[in-house]
C-alpha cells in the first residue's frame, strides 16, 4: 500500500507546481473508490469461480469468507487486502497519462468503469484461473494485469483528451525533482511487497523474487543513466529515477520464475527500452502522455512479459516451464497475453472515457487549465507565498 503515496509523490513532482495537488487528490480518492468497489464486488469478480473472463458474485461483500478462511498458507483476508493494493495502484498509474487537464469528476467515473470492466476481467483471466491462466501465461506480479493494462488505458486517455495547452511551445519541466526522488524511493520499498509477496508464502520463491527485484532495478538504473549520458551528454536524477521504475516494471512479471542472471538482463534491457519509450516512441505516437506512463509501464511491461517467457527456462537459470512446454511456445503464449491485454484495456478505456465525457465532460476549460487545476478544481495551492 505504500505504492499509493509513492506514485502520488512521483507524479506530483513531475508536474508543474500549479497541478501537484490535483494529482495527489486524484490518486488518493481513486484509491478509496477502488478499495470500496473491491470489497463490494471486485474481489469476487476477480477471484471467485466463474467463466473464462469473469468470476461470479459469490463472494460479493466478502460473503462466505470467515475470519479463519485460508488462501494458500495465508488467511484469506490478507489475500483480499493484498490484491486490493494491486487494483488500487493500477488505477492510480493511469491518471499520470492525462494529468494537468482532466476534470476530477471524469477521473472518478472513468476509474469505476475501467476498474470493473478491464482490471477485474484481466485479473481473473491471469490470476483467477481464467482464460489466460488456462493458456499458460506467466505473470508473477502484474506485468499484464497492472502495467500493460494501465499503460494502454492511459494512452487512450491521453489521445482522447488531447495535448495540454501550450504543449510543444512552452517548457513543461518537473517542478520538484526531490519529490520525484522521494516518490521513487517509496515506490521501490512498496514494490518488494508486490513482488516478494506474490509468492504467497515466506519461501524460496519469495526470496528469489526479492533478490531479482533488487538486481533488475539496479541494472535498469545503470542502463538508463548510461544511455541517457551517451545521448544527452549528462546523466540526470530524473533518468535514474525513471530507470528505477523501468526496472521494477520489467521484472514484475518475471520476479519469481527467472534466475538472477535473467533478472539482470531483463533490468538492463528494460532500462534502455524505457528510455526509448519516453524519447523516441512518444514522438512517433505524437501523444502528450504527461508522466510517460506508456513509455515506461507499457514498454517495459511488454518487454518484461516477453522476456519472462525466455528466462523462465531452467537451462537459463529459471524455475522451468510446465511439462512439455518449450521456450518458443511459452514466448508465444506471453505475446498472446500481451495482445489480449492491449486490446481489452484499450477498448474498455475508450468506452469508459466516452461515457465520462458524455456525463460530465473530460477536459477543463483552457483558462482553468492555464491557471492550474489545484486552485480551480480543489480550491487549494501547494505552495502559498
Where on the chain are the PLM-derived regions?
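Glycine- and aromatic-enriched membrane alpha-helices
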Residues: 1-385
Amino acid at each position: 500500500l505504500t505504492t499509493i503515496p509513492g506514485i502520488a509523490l512521483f507524479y506530483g513532482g513531475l508536474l508543474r507546481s500549479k497541478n501537484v495537488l490535483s494529482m495527489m487528490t486524484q490518486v488518493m480518492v481513486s484509491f478509496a473508490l477502488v478499495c470500496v468497489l473491491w470489497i463490494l464486488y471486485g474481489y469476487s469478480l476477480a477471484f471467485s469461480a466463474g467463466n473464462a473472463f469473469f468470476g461470479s458474485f459469490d463472494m460479493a461483500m466478502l460473503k462466505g469468507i470467515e475470519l479463519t478462511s485460508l488462501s494458500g498458507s495465508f488467511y484469506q483476508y490478507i489475500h483480499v487486502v493484498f490484491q486490493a493494493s494491486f487494483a488500487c495502484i493500477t488505477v492510480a498509474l493511469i491518471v499520470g497519462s492525462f494529468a494537468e487537464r482532466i476534470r476530477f469528476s471524469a477521473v472518478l467515473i472513468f476509474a469505476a468503469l475501467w476498474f470493473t470492466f478491464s482490471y477485474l476481467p484481466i485479473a481473473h483471466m491471469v490470476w483467477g484461473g481464467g482464460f489466460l491462466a488456462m493458456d499458460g501465461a506467466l505473470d508473477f506480479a502484474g506485468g499484464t494485469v497492472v502495467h500493460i493494462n494501465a499503460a494502454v488505458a492511459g494512452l487512450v486517455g491521453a489521445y482522447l483528451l488531447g495535448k495540454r495547452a501550450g504543449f510543444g511551445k512552452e517548457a513543461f519541466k518537473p517542478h520538484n525533482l526531490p519529490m520525484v526522488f522521494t516518490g521513487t524511493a517509496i515506490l521501490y520499498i512498496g514494490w518488494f511487497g508486490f513482488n516478494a509477496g506474490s509468492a504467497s508464502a515466506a519461501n524460496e520463491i519469495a526470496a528469489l523474487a526479492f533478490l531479482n527485484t533488487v538486481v533488475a532495478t539496479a541494472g535498469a538504473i545503470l542502463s538508463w543513466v548510461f544511455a541517457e549520458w551517451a545521448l544527452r551528454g549528462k546523466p540526470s536524477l530524473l533518468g535514474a529515477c525513471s530507470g528505477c521504475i523501468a526496472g521494477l516494471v520489467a521484472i514484475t512479471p518475471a520476479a519469481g520464475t527467472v534466475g538472477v542472471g535473467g533478472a539482470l538482463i531483463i533490468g538492463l534491457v528494460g532500462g534502455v527500452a524505457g528510455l526509448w519509450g519516453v524519447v523516441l516512441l512518444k514522438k512517433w505516437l505524437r501523444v502528450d502522455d504527461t508522466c510517460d506512463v506508456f513509455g515506461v509501464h507499457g514498454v517495459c511491461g511488454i518487454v518484461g512479459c516477453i522476456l519472462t517467457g525466455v528466462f523462465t527456462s531452467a537451462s537459463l537459470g529459471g524455475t522451468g516451464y510446465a511439462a512439455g512446454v518449450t521456450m518458443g511456445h511459452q514466448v508465444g503464449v506471453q505475446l498472446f497475453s500481451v495482445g489480449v491485454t492491449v486490446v481489452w484495456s484499450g477498448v474498455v478505456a475508450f468506452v469508459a472515457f466516452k461515457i465520462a465525457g458524455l456525463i460530465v465532460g473530460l477536459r477543463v476549460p483552457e483558462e482553468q487549465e492555464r491557471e492550474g487545476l489545484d486552485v480551480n478544481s480543489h480550491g487549494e495551492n501547494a505552495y502559498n507565498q
